[in-house]
Amino acid sequence: MKHEFAKRLAKGVLGIAAAGVFAAGVGSASAEELKVYTAIEADDLKRYAEEFNKQYPDIEIKWVRDSTGIVTAKLLAEKQNPQADIVWGLAATSLMLLKNEGMTHAYMPKGGDKLDKRFIDTANPPHWTGMDAWVAAICVNTIEAEANNLPIPTSWQDLTKPIYKGHVVMPNPNSSGTGFLDVASWLQMFGEEGGWEFLDALHQNIAWYTHSGSKPCRQAGSGETPIGVSFAYRGAKVKAKGAPIEIVIPSEGIGWDMEATAIMKGTKHLDAAKKLADFTVTREANVMYNSVYAVIAYPGIAEPVKHYPDNVAEAMIDNDFEWVASNRMRILKEWQKRYDSKSEPKS
């Protein structure tokens, strides 16, 4: 399969991705360097690397970080000349695509059998293992909503009402994993025809599309827009900083994806990559994930996350990950053709 669209996108983002390359860890001359591609939120990277280095101080993580869509496109563009040793914290649907392209190394991390089976690839041995679930949400600035006489939306369909015209921001799914899980979930919730009809109606109310899943919620928090379609993690973070936002879980249900880990086939640092994969499934790592995500892969240890909506787990749709992964490129091309005219410029 030729991923021409992914290659075109990657050409435009290589400079951005390069800017997201930085090292974290011990930094000693004897440390083995491990290039780790990720879409983990930037504010968590330092802490994640430090926790890993408590167990493996002789491995230095060199992060390459960007939004999910951009990281996925970069990996696909590098298929013939892989640069990443391992991916830690990318959408499971993206890793399924890489697996289908023969780009991942099958490996069951030590202790991986303790994870919730929904968070483990069905192949034996698996090509990826999950970490946590990130879920869609709507961030509403209550002050801006009141100033614009906007009722707090309670459903996805509410966002298509004329009263919200020009007051909604959401992520571009070609750049953002959150944007993609939104679009993929709407196509599942409303059916293929109904899903695109919903997106057509929503597009009429969109002020602009961002290239980050966090940005719509940040912009709602700062008052740049009354409503940002984002994800619950970022909503909780923004609310914790004192922003006047309400995190809405729409009544139809919410799309979600797993952050997951996969070793890249052909890595020259296989032993080090396996050590990182082993760490990612540990109880300690999952406690770390639970500091910001309410749903994690390791059963029985999750604690409530401050400012997270209470009904997240119940609202998560029955997501067909295989369908999402196999239809990813088709969905993204169609979305790009229909709606990209409102995307903000790439920075």
For each feature predicted by the language model, list its residue ranges.
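Sec/Tat signal peptide C-region and signal peptidase I cleavage site
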Residues: 25-31
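Short, polar/charged alpha-helical segment
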Residues: 35, 39-62, 76
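Extracytoplasmic ligand-binding site segments that recognize negatively charged/polar headgroups
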Residues: 39, 43-46, 69, 83-224
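A ligand-binding cleft/hinge motif common to bilobed small-molecule-binding domains
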Residues: 93-97, 221, 225-244
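Periplasmic-binding protein-like
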Residues: 118, 163-171, 198-203, 209-210, 241-265, 280-302, ...
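A bilobed periplasmic-binding-protein/Venus flytrap-type ligand-binding module shared by bacterial periplasmic
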Residues: 139-144, 183-187, 257-269, 288-289
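Conserved C-terminal helix/tail region of periplasmic/extracytoplasmic solute-binding proteins
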Residues: 320-347
